[in-house]
């Protein structure tokens, strides 16, 4: 989940002021965590402490009512409501907050079931649910590819062969959710907050990356909804590449103590 947080913080200052410079300042003045981080922490907290996803999302978002970049209009109304109900959203919010599920559950069927549950309080449209499941599936795939005994043996023999095999399987996953993954256009700078755009775009950017930092730089410099694209790409890149220690430490320095506590608990319980 820290990959999502890093992508969110790195992209936060560029969400409404896009950069197309690959060498942008990663953690510069004006960067901060946004709703993407708050909601990701909320999902982790729910799983770790036996809370419902809705209860945890409401708690954390009410605890931090005015994050950098603000909450989306309908989501903000949902937070303030005395009787919050799902509003059939297919926005990218379901995809950006789902990453803890892929680390805290081990069986794919359970990962996908829980991913759907994380979307339902707000993003109960089929595309909102699909976006959450697709991202969780991708993270789970790379987590298993990196840490399985078979993968370790294969990497010892031929690292490139192992990586190529994992990437081929990832692209198959992408196509299983988005049939036109290989043929659609991914123009720079298009601001589209739907799962139908953000998730395949994030998969495409991840497929071009050679390291965690490269993935984040490709995501942010593509423009558009920079913090959320950064969060989705970062969440998958963490599972594929791991995260450099200096980037971990820098991102954590932006977080308040209650979020750090959840991160610590998450690290102790991740599969």
Which ranges hold each PLM region?
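Structured, active/binding-site neighborhoods that engage oxygen-rich ligands
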Residues: 1-271
């Amino acid at each position: 989940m820290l990959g999502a947080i890093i992508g969110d913080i790195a992209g936060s200052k560029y969400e409404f002021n896009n950069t197309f410079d690959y060498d942008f300042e990663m953690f510069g003045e004006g960067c901060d965590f946004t709703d993407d981080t708050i909601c990701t922490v909320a999902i982790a907290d729910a799983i770790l402490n036996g809370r419902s996803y809705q209860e945890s999302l409401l708690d954390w978002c009410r605890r931090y009512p005015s994050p950098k970049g603000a909450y989306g209009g309908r989501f903000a109304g949902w937070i303030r409501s005395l009787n919050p109900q799902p509003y059939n959203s297919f926005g990218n919010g379901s995809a950006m907050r789902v990453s803890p599920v892929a680390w805290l559950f081990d069986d794919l069927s359970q990962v996908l079931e829980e991913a759907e549950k994380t979307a339902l309080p707000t993003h109960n449209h089929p595309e909102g649910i699909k976006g959450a499941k697709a991202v969780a599936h991708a993270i789970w795939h790379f987590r298993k590819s990196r840490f399985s005994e078979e993968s370790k043996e294969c990497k010892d023999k031929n690292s490139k062969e192992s990586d190529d095999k994992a990437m081929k399987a990832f692209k198959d996953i992408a196509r299983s959710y988005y049939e036109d993954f290989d043929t659609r256009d991914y123009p720079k700078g298009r601001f589209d907050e739907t799962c139908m755009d953000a998730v395949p775009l994030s998969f495409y950017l991840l497929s071009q990356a050679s390291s965690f930092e490269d993935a984040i730089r490709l995501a942010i410099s593509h423009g558009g909804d920079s913090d959320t694209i950064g969060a989705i790409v970062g969440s998958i890149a963490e599972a594929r590449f791991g995260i450099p220690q200096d980037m971990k430490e820098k991102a954590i320095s932006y977080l308040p103590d209650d979020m750090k506590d959840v991160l610590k608990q998450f690290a102790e319980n991740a599969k």
